[in-house]
Amino acid sequence: MKTPKNDVYTVSRLNGEVRQLLEGQLGRIWLNAEISNFAAPGSGHWYLTLKDNFSQIRCAMFKGRNQAVTFRPANGQQVLVKGNISVYEPRGDYQLLIESMLPAGDGLLAQQYEALKMKLAAEGLFASDTKRPLPANIQKIGVVTSPTGAAIRDILHVLARRDSSIEVIIYPTPVQGSDAAKSICDAINLANSRAEVDVLLVTRGGGSLEDLWSFNDEGLAHTIYNSGIPVVSAVGHEVDMTISDYVADLRAPTPSAGAELLSKDADNKAQKLLSQLSRLKQAWQHYQLKKQSQVQTIEHRLQKQDPQRRLQMYEQSFDEMQLRLQQAMQTKLHAYALKQQNLSSRLANQSPQHRLTLEAQRLSYLSAKLNDAMDDKLKMSEQRLAHRAQQLDTVSPLATLSRGYSITLTGSGKVVQAPSDTCVGDTLTTRLRDGSVTSTVVEVS
């Protein structure tokens, strides 16, 4: 049988082409699974297995990615991960390189939220050029919210404090539950049909991601976008960002902040600046969404020729060798521990008490000898110090002054040694034993 020359693969070439094929065909995927065999070596990378009832896959999450994870993964935990299928070429194992990880419950909602946000951004619902300016002189505000919630009380309190002349019309609707999104849409449509207010404030107080989920509805997004009345979205707290915040003409971080935006105040310039900043933020967020999509496309193209991928492969290999070394060291230490126990048992049968007594006596003798030597050394040092101090005192200028002499200095601090060192009019300082005398030169001879 002839051996083919052109179609013979090496193992490295085969694994490399399999990796490129998997990465090119599947790309980035989401996976919902249970964690097992979780390991976090000193390199900072994470290695784990994701499994369900029938299958499992090895995974790696490198340090630059896992630093963004807000919880500590544990075996048995259900998670939602996003990553890329790849092949660890040295072993020929295919694995998932994880980019992000969320707890399964919050993760599914977050995935739906991100998918809808990308879709609506692509449709242009977040574009800054579609945002309508708020009326310059607002007389009536329509509030779409629950009539019994804390949000409406905060809004009415702020409006009463800032501008009691503004009329408020409440379009009551539930803001939480399976039917809440449709009810909010109906309230917005009702306000548009009546055309009785200058602006709509769609709002509710804070809550969990599930509590705010009605404001992440696609139908509600289109209703806000198609509203003939400008819409301000003020949902939850400042850290909460819902789809309604992105599509509204203006976003306020809280219900109270929404009321402040829509009411007059002596500091009108600050209100305008806040509005401009909010629009700038929305434009920046829209720009980020657009660029994020472009970056993801470029990342996918670069994955096949990413030098960091090869570095990560070597790091993964190093981590595996490190784990094996740790296991070998633990086995060796256990063997040494058993040997030490055996030696200790044998030593206990041959008491070294006599030798310890001799060594204790020797130690006491050496300690006393060391103390004597230290005392002798200290006395010699004190004598040398006293001798040096006497020598310094002999040549010290201060000793000369104490014997009745004086030293005259020029204004620059130079010692006057001859008449030529001074000029008429110079100020001189004469140092005496108990002080100094300042004088002026009137004649030099």
Curated annotation (Swiss-Prot):
A biological-process GO annotation: DNA catabolic process
EC nos: 3.1.11.6
Subcellular location: Cytoplasm
One Gene Ontology term, aspect cellular component: exodeoxyribonuclease VII complex
Keyword Cytoplasm: yes
Keyword vocabulary terms for this entry: Cytoplasm, Exonuclease, Hydrolase, Nuclease
CDD domains referenced in this protein's UniProt entry, alphabetically: ExoVII_LU_OBF (cd04489)
Role summary: Bidirectionally degrades single-stranded DNA into large acid-insoluble oligonucleotides, which are then degraded further into small acid-soluble oligonucleotides.
NCBIfam families according to UniProt: xseA
Protein family: Belongs to the XseA family.
Name of the featured protein: Exodeoxyribonuclease 7 large subunit
Organism for this UniProt entry: Shewanella pealeana (strain ATCC 700345 / ANG-SQ1)
Gene that this polypeptide is encoded by: xseA
